[in-house]
Structure formats: structure tokens, C-alpha cells
Amino acid sequence: MTDKAHQCVIIGIAGASASGKSLIASTLYRELREQVGDQHIGVIPEDGYYKDQSHLSMEERVKTNYDHPSAMDHNLLLEHLQSLKAGKPIELPLYSYTEHTRKKETVHLEPKKVIILEGILLLTDIRLRQEMNFSIFVDTPLDICLMRRMKRDVNERGRSMDSVMAQYQKTVRPMFLQFIEPSKQYADIIVPRGGKNRIAIDILKAKISQFFE
């Protein structure tokens, strides 16, 4: 491995949908970026690695179980993490929540000292876990996650309340219990109460800051 590979630190943040993962990731990114600069830290959302469904009709796309590991292109994510560790840039895929497939455009991402990786299914894949220097599970009660998800999907993603509730009952909750919650055992740190747990965020900041020394 190259010196660059030793310098790239991968931190995984997992948890239920609407548990506060993205808030913790964005807070850590924003506050650490102010300390070390944009060139040293980046964020990769797992959502961008939902499989491309542009070949499917909209009717078929909405039937996809987005909370099952098979919906993710973890092979591509693994390839990208390994590229960053090897000092190579990647083209970060983007996902459209309204079109239910990948966008045509990508975001160019250069290797960073620290990469924060966040998503619901990260800890279910042993290959991804092996690339992480340490991992976090955001442990938020499901009823709170549902309320947050309802508000987010209706206001930001153009969903109806009925469709959000139907999806929650059919796939979100069952897949959480089958895949996501059991993956909590692999986390090095468990954060209760979601993205507004300031004490936990400060502890995580202190831990991550060690990698910049």
C-alpha cells in the first residue's frame, strides 16, 4: 500500500432511515472542515450507490425494496473506497429521490485525509466494514424515525403521507429489524438520541481530530 493509502481514514455512520445519520455526518463535516480545511475531509452518502434503474419504468422503480441490501451497488462503493485509499479520485454518483434512479451527473471527489461514509446498510456488508477505521451506529427509536421520515419525505421528496406509511409498514420497518438493527453489533460507537446529541458529536470530533495530527 502507498503512503496515501495509510493517510485515508474511513469512518462509517449507520442507523435507521431518518435516525439522524446525515445530521451527524454533516455536523462533523462542517465543524471539522472549519478546523482542517475542505481539502482534508469529505462525505460520501450511501444513497448515491442505489443501483441504476434508468432501464426500468417508473412503475417498476417504485416497487424496489430500497431498504434491502440488494438495492445497493456496494461493489461500486467498495471500489471507490479502495480508489480513494490508493490516492485516486472518484466520480461520486448522485441519486434522485423523485425519479427513483441515479442522476446522470456525478461529483468529482479527490482523496481526503478523512472520509465520512453514511448510510442505512453500511454495516451489513463485511467488505465495507473492513475498509472502515471505525464505525458508528445512530440508535434512535423507530417511532421517532417514522415521524422524521414522514416530515422529510412529504416536504422534501414530494411523497404523500399514505405512500410513506405504506412503505414504512411494508419494507422500512421489516428490513430494519432484519438487517439494520442486527448490524449494530459491528459498530465501535453507538450514539443514542440521533443527530442532536451534542455530547456524542463532541466526542466523535475529538476522536476524528486525532487522525489530523
From Swiss-Prot:
Alphabetic keyword roster: ATP-binding, Cytoplasm, Kinase, Nucleotide-binding, Transferase
Phylogenetic lineage: Bacteria, Pseudomonadati, Pseudomonadota, Gammaproteobacteria, Enterobacterales
GO (cellular component) term, any one: cytoplasm
Disulfide bond sites: none
Main location: cytoplasm
UniProt-recorded name of the protein: Uridine kinase
The protein's Enzyme Commission number: 2.7.1.48
Involved pathway(s): Pyrimidine metabolism; CTP biosynthesis via salvage pathway; CTP from cytidine: step 1/3; Pyrimidine metabolism; UMP biosynthesis via salvage pathway; UMP from uridine: step 1/1
PANTHER family: URIDINE KINASE
Domain of life: Bacteria
GO terms of molecular function: ATP binding; cytidine kinase activity; uridine kinase activity
Gene Ontology terms describing biological process: CTP salvage; UMP salvage
Family (UniProt): Belongs to the uridine kinase family.
Any Pfam family hit: PRK
Protein's gene: udk
